[in-house]
Each structure stands twice: as structure tokens, then as C-alpha cells.
């Protein structure tokens, strides 16, 4: 898919004319371009901050030289490069073909012989790459294009040079958790070609089954599965197990090299003597061959029809499995609803498609604003043209058993609080980014902040973009009228209202965690560093080294709460003064192994205690002294921090959390007593349980479970069409959450009845946010959505 160029994109790179955007990666943007002779190439550019690093330039120059030596048939050849340009770039041959990810998502798992054919081609490509002194380090389905005569491996040009490990950068993230090797997850600086062989095995699992071998709810959980549980090989044909299991040996020395793999595969592929045994048509299903031919001829890919239990949109870009046991969702309309044409001077407005308790709420194509919406005065004139909303339940929904998906709850619930209306004159909008959107939106005053490589500030009222940062932001926090962000090695702050630069400093390593509170910015950097900065001017307040390096993710970084910084260092949890770095106390929490191989997660509560989840343990430590109030032990590890609710246990007060296997615990905050525990039917994620209005809400697998906070009695359960993503949001008697089935759901919090749902073009990312009657959500379709929390995409309401 090629996107249009923005006003900030170059029109020429070196001798090439730039035609469009192909995408973006961790190191920069990728463009489609054309040479003077008409040859099309893919050009990968390098981010500005990396280009300013002289050590990176040396590494990049040497790897370009090595990449030129890769000449295998199954790789996309390097055409040209300029590592000394102001913005370094690398051009490779453009291959108009679908990726392996697209083929499997749209056509289903491959037959066993097709998997062998794919494996042989990729193994030969790896032999060429390794022979040039490179390790790919990010071999995955989206980096393998499939053409008629075999696969083509791409994105090896900025791999890690194995001939000079001194040049390996510690502040450049390379690799995808679902497909990386164990040694890469532990230390990405010391991998060898055997790491690519493990990734090949993981990729073959996806090709043969339709799901990756490791598929946690987030990168931390995925790495946990990789290192502790082993691959999920459900659905893998027995005849492929010896091949794939040999590639996925935990010890690198036990894996075959690419030449061994080719020798192992040759008898299966070429023993028949068939002339066409090396082509896609000999092995792939007819539909997949048609997809390849269509892409080669410039035709767009045809999306598969969606069935009730099918694969139509059950596979997102991550390759997650389609739902198997979920109840069927009502099918979307065969076409977008027809919106009456407004007068020439009146812009079109979105029609309300689906009302409360109806089918999926859909934003009709041309009638939905991409970016800023029309003026309120125009909305009043156009509102009369909108068709009335449907009020009946979708026909394909059958009445579920009590307590499930909106049937009568097992226990009567109290009446919800009266709903809060959206601001007068406001109407729903969506804004489409030019790049992927990730994470949870932040709302402050009249702006919503979203990360899409840069930080984008959108006007709450209209959806217009107020500004965006000029730098990439991998980490972001909004506090005290400032945006604090990091592009990796640089920490910077901007005015949250206007986007003006306030300050920027260079850090010694890649920032993977960032928090801001009470005038202090706390960062955690790769290699075990933790730093505190003055939020207003950027001066470094203090720094410690030797912090844990087993889990370098935003969830596992140093924590900042009410003037206290919590650092996991030398097997101890240390409480430091956030302004001075002075140690107040420390507790022997243990190392990663003694904590069950999972990060330590904590919550500081207003009762003067910090509640800590460390593996299978939960502890209550006094904030002032570190004194242990109580200790609780569970049979399974906890991935999420505890949730504290003030008040006595008889009114629902206490500490709530769910373990990795999905069991929900209610602990007495005064003594740690296990008041009740309820086992759900699927594993939990790293998101904390949500407690509101006497209810405990927890997303576990495809189910959203609601329990009575006092007794643990199940109130209701809602079954979504895919795994629940992020933490639900509760406000004004409604609960909002996203799912991997591309839907944003809104339920009545008291009984679980479906209020409305929005069908997006991708998986919901992060968690929805509700503010002043508006729910904000981001999707992998590159859109930010702002919807009426009560009605979804209802008509505009004005005073």
C-alpha cells in the first residue's frame, strides 16, 4: 500500500524521484521512488537524530557496504545508497508483491508443501545475508514478500553487522517479540546468524497455522512466553514439526544453519522432477496465486468475505488468531449507508448508523470527516438530512444465557449515575494519520495528544490538528502544561498548548520509560540507568546506574509516585526522593528469577502504603519507612500492578489484582487476607483490573468479566469477537473497551448490555479514554476517533 506524500516529505532523494510513502520503521521512513530510467525502488531513510550520531554513521556505512555484497536470488538487491548524505538513505529494488503476512491473513494458512517451498527460499536468502557478514535480526512475515518464483527477504540493509560487534548500537531497537530468538530478547547486541534461523522457524509457524508462536497481549507478555513457556504450535501439521522444532531450539548451537535447511528440504520439493516445482503456482492455493498476480499487475488486494467464525478481519497485522469460540458478530451492511446529499454550501456530516443496542456503529466513508470537521452552524443545517437511527437489536444476536452479553444479570445492579452530555455543539470526528498510531491517547483541557511517530495535538472540539512535534516520540508524558517526550537518545519538552520547544538534552542511552509528576521527569534508559530531570528547564537532578536490565519496557521502568521514585536495583526495591535521589529505604525484593521472571509492578496508594506485585507475591510496604505490613503468596505470577480501592472491605475497599492465569483476587488492605478469588476462563494481561461503583471489571482473553467487589459474585460477562486490548474505561454508567476484532465496544456497566460498537479498520491500540461525555480511541487503521460516549456516532447536538 502506497500513501500520498505530505508537505514535509522530500520530492527527490539522490537521483530518484519520490512517488509516495511505503511505510515507516524504527529507523526512519520508507518511500517508493523512480529512477531516471523508470525503475522503481524502495528507499529507506534514517531518522535525523540517528543521522547526527557519528558512531551510527560509521556503522551504517559499513553495513551498506556489506549489504551491497548480498546478491542472493531471494533477496531484494541494494541499488544505491548515500550514507554520507544529510539524511542517509538506502535504495533497494522495489518488489510489487504481497507480504507473507498479507497472504496468510487474506488466504489462510499455507499447505505443508508451500511452507517447505517458502522455507527453502528464505533459507537461501539467509545464506546470502550471513555470507555478507550480516544478521537480519527482524525476520518476520511482513519482511518476506512472495512472488511467483519464490520469496524475497527485505529490510536486511540496516541489520546488525556481525563482523564488527563493537559498532552494534545499544540505543536502536531491532526485532519483533513475536518472532525474535531467546538470545535476542535477552541481549540484542550479541546475536548470531542462528537467531535468524529461530525467527525463520517462528515465521513458518505463522505460515502454517495463521498465528505466531508467541502472542501475548503486549511485548512484555510475549517475551515472557518466549523465555518461559515455549511456542504455541496449535494447528501445526505433524509433518512440519521436525523442521520447525529444529529451527526453534532454545540453544543457538542446536539449530541448523541455512545450508543444512536447504539440504533437508530439497528432497521434499524437487524429488518429483516437475518443471514448475519452484514456482508459487505449484504449491500455493489458487487464491494466493491470484493475489500475487494482482499485486504484480498493480491491482489492489481483494479482501476476503467475512463469515461468522471466519478469518475475514480476525487477523490483524500482528497475525493474531481469529476467534474460534466467540459468538458470531452481526454482519456489517453490504455497503455504506447512503447519506442524502446536502446543499452545495453545507458539508456532509456522518449519519448515525446503528443506535443504542444496535449493530456495529459505522462511520460512512465520504460523510465522515478525515481531520477537521465542519462548523457548528453548518452542522445544524445538515443535521436534518441524517436518517433516523435504528433502535432494534441486530437480527444475528441471539439471546444469551443469563449474565452473558447483556442478558439479565445474575445479581441485580444499582442504578447508574446520570449520563453527562457531550459539550454543546460538538459532534463525532476522526482524524487519519499518515503513519501508524499506537498507545493510549492523553486528554488535557481542550487537546487530545496522540503518538504516531511524532506527538500530534488535536483539538477536542473539531478534530483539527493544532500542531505536531518535529521529532519522533517513542515515549511521552503530559503534565503541568508540558509535553515531555523522547525519541530514544534525546529527551525534550514542549509547550502543551502551542508546541513550542522548551528544552532538549541528550541522554547517554535509549530512553525506554518516561514519567512526569510534580515538576520532575523520571527516565529509565537501556543498560540500567535511571535519571531524574527538572521538568521546567531540563537540568539533570540525579542519576543511578545498575538498575534491572531484564525488562526494558515502559511497564517495567522506574516508577514515579507523589515525590518518590521506585527503582529495582541489585535485587532490592529502592525508594528514592524524586528531587534529590536520596534513598529513603530499600527492601530485598529479589532478582528477576526470584520474581518469577516477570517485572515488579507497584501502586502507591493514598493510605500511606505502596502495594507491590513481585512474581507470585503481593506486599504492602509503608511509603515512609518501607516496613512490611503484610505479604500474600499466589500460585501464579502477576503481570499487572495491584489496584487499590479506599474504604472498608464491607463497602468494597481493598486491593484487587489478577494473576497471569486469569484468577482475580480481592485482598484485605489491612492484613492481606484473601477475601475472595474467582477464576476466569482465559489468561490475564499486563493491564490492572478496574474497580468502579462497587464492581470489579477485568478483561481476560475475549471475555470482559464483572464481579461484585464485596463478595466476588459474578454479575455478568460479555464475550467479544477478539481478545480485549488494553484496560477498559468506565464513566457515567458505561464501560468502553477495544478488541482485536477491530471493534470499540460500549456496554452498560450495570448489566453488560451492548450500548453501541464501532467497526474500525484495524485493532484498537492502548485503552480508550473518556472525558466530558466523549470517548477517544486509536486504531491500527491509522485513525483517532472521538465519539459520543452515550450514542457513538449520533447526530450533532447543539444548544
Curated annotation (Swiss-Prot):
Region (Disordered): 295-343, 393-426
InterPro entries associated with the record: Kinase-like_dom_sf, PQQ_b-propeller_rpt, PQQ_rpt_dom, Prot_kinase_dom, Protein_kinase_ATP_BS, Quinoprotein_ADH-like_sf, Ser/Thr_kinase_AS, WD40/YVTN_repeat-like_dom_sf
Coiled coil: none
Keyword Flavoprotein: no
Span of domain Protein kinase: 16-271
Enzyme Commission number: 2.7.11.1
Variant or mutagenesis effect after changing residue 71 to A: No autophosphorylation
Annotated catalysed reactions: L-seryl-[protein] + ATP = O-phospho-L-seryl-[protein] + ADP + H(+); L-threonyl-[protein] + ATP = O-phospho-L-threonyl-[protein] + ADP + H(+)
Positions contributing to ATP binding: 22-30, 44
Composition-biased stretches (Pro residues): 325-343, 411-421
GO molecular function annotation: ATP binding; protein serine kinase activity; protein serine/threonine kinase activity
Enzyme class, spelled out: transferase
Family: Belongs to the protein kinase superfamily. Ser/Thr protein kinase family.
Subunit description: Interacts (via the N-terminal kinase domain) with KbpA; the interaction prevents autophosphorylation of AfsK.
Protein name, as recorded: Serine/threonine-protein kinase AfsK
Amino acid at each position: 500500500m502506497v500513501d500520498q506524500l505530505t508537505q514535509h516529505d522530500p520530492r527527490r532523494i539522490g537521483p530518484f524521484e519520490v512517488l509516495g510513502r511505503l511505510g515507516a520503521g524504527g529507523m526512519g521512513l520508507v518511500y517508493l521512488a523512480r529512477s531516471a530510467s523508470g525503475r522503481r525502488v524502495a528507499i529507506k531513510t534514517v531518522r535525523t537524530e540517528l543521522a547526527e550520531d557519528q558512531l551510527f554513521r560509521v556503522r551504517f556505512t559499513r553495513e551498506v557496504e556489506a549489504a551491497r555484497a548480498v546478491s542472493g536470488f531471494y533477496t531484494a538487491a541494494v541499488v544505491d545508497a548515500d550514507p554520507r548524505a544529510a539524511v542517509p538513505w538506502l535504495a533497494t529494488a522495489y518488489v510489487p508483491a504481497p507480504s507473507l503476512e498479507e497472504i496468510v491473513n487474506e488466504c489462510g494458512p499455507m499447505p505443508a508443501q508451500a511452507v517447505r517451498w517458502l522455507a527453502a527460499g528464505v533459507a537461501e536468502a539467509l545464506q546470502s545475508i550471513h555470507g555478507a557478514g550480516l544478521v537480519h535480526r527482524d525476520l518476520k512475515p511482513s519482511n518476506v514478500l512472495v512472488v511467483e518464483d519464490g520469496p524475497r527477504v527485505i529490510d536486511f540493509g540496516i541489520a546488525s553487522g556481525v563482523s564488527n560487534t563493537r559498532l552494534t548500537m545499544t540505543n536502536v531497537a531491532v526485532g519483533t517479540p513475536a518472532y525474535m530468538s531467546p538470545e535476542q530478547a535477552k541481549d540484542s547486541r550479541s546475536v548470531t546468524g542462528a537467531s535468524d534461523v529461530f525467527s525463520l522457524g517462528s515465521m513458518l509457524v505463522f505460515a502454517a497455522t495463521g498465528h505466531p508462536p508467541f502472542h501475548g497481549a503486549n511485548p512484555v507478555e510475549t517475551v515472557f512466553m518466549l523465555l518461559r513457556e515455549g511456542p504455541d504450535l496449535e494447528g501445526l501439521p505433524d509433518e512440519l514439526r521436525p523442521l520447525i522444532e529444529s529451527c526453534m531450539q532454545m540453544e543457538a548451537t542446536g539449530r541448523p544453519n541455512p545450508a543444512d535447511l536447504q539440504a533437508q528440504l530439497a528432497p521434499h520439493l524437487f524429488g518429483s522432477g516437475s518443471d514448475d516445482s519452484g514456482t508459487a503456482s505449484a504449491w500455493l492455493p489458487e487464491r494466493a496465486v491470484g493475489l500475487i498476480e494482482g499485486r504484480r499487475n498493480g491491482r489492489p488486494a481483494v479482501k476476503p468475505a467475512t463469515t461468522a467464525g471466519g478469518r475475514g478481519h480476525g487477523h490483524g497485522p500482528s497475525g493474531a488468531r481469529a476467534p474460534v469460540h466467540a459468538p458470531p458478530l452481526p454482519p456489517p451492511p453490504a455497503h455504506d449507508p447512503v447519506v442524502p446529499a446536502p446543499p452545495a454550501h453545507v458539508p456532509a456530516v456522518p449519519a448515525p448508523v446503528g443506535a443504542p443496542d444496535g449493530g456495529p456503529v459505522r462511520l460512512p466513508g465520504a460523510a465522515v470527516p478525515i481531520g477537521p470537521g465542519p462548523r457548528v452552524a453548518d452542522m445544524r443545517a445538515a443535521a436534518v438530512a441524517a436518517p433516523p437511527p435504528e433502535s432494534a437489536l441486530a437480527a444475528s444476536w441471539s439471546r444469551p444465557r443469563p449474565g452473558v452479553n447483556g442478558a439479565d444479570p445474575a445479581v441485580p445492579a444499582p442504578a447508574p449515575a446520570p449520563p453527562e452530555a457531550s459539550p454543546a455543539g460538538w459532534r463525532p470526528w476522526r482524524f487519519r494519520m499518515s503513519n501508524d498510531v499506537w498507545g493510549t491517547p492523553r486528554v488535557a483541557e481542550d487537546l487530545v495528544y496522540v503518538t504516531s511517530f511524532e506527538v500530534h495535538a488535536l483539538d477536542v472540539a473539531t478534530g483539527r490538528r493544532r500542531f505536531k512535534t518535529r521529532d519522533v516520540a517513542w515515549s511521552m508524558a503530559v503534565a503541568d502544561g508540558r509535553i515531555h517526550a523522547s525519541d530514544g537518545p534525546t529527551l525534550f519538552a514542549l509547550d502543551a498548548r502551542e508546541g513550542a520547544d522548551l528544552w532538549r538534552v541528550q541522554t547517554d542511552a535509549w530512553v525506554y520509560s518516561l514519567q512526569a509528576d510534580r515538576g520532575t521527569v523520571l527516565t529509565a534508559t537501556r543498560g540500567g540507568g535511571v535519571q531524574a530531570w527538572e521538568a521546567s528547564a531540563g537540568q539533570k537532578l540525579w542519576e543511578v546506574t545498575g538498575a534491572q536490565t531484564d525488562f526494558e519496557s515502559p511497564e517495567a521502568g522506574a516508577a514515579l509516585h507523589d515525590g518518590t521514585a521506585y527503582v529495582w536495583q541489585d535485587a532490592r526495591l529502592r525508594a528514592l526522593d524524586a528531587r534529590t535521589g536520596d534513598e529513603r529505604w530499600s527492601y530485598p525484593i529479589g532478582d528477576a528469577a526470584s520474581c518469577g521472571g516477570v517485572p515488579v509492578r507497584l501502586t502507591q496508594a493514598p493510605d500511606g502504603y505502596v502495594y507491590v506485585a513481585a512474581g507470585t507475591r503481593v506486599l504492602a510496604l509503608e511509603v515512609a519507612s518501607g516496613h512490611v505490613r503484610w505479604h500474600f503468596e499466589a500460585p501464579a505470577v502477576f503481570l499487572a500492578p495491584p489496584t487499590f480501592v479506599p474504604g472498608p472491605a464491607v463497602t468494597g475497599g481493598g486491593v484487587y489484582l489478577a494473576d497471569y492465569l486469569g484468577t482475580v483476587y480481592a485482598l484485605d488492605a489491612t492484613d492481606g487476607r484473601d477475601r475472595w478469588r474467582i477464576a476466569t476462563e482465559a489468561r490475564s494481561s499486563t493491564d490492572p483490573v478496574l474497580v468502579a461503583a462497587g464492581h470489579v471489571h477485568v478483561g481476560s482473553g475475549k471475555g470482559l468479566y464483572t464481579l461484585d467487589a464485596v463478595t466476588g459474585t459474578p454479575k455478568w460477562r460479555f464475550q467479544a469477537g477478539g481478545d480485549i486490548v488494553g484496560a477498559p474505561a468506565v464513566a457515567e454508567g458505561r464501560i468502553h473497551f477495544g478488541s482485536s476484532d477491530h471493534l470499540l465496544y460500549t456496554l452498560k456497566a450495570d448489566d453488560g448490555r451492548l450500548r453501541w460498537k464501532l467497526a474500525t479498520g484495524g485493532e484498537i491500540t492502548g485503552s480508550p479514554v473518556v472525558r466530558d461525555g466523549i470517548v477517544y480511541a486509536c486504531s491500527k487503521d491509522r485513525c483517532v476517533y472521538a465519539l459520543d460516549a452515550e450514542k457513538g456516532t449520533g447526530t450533532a447536538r447543539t444548544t
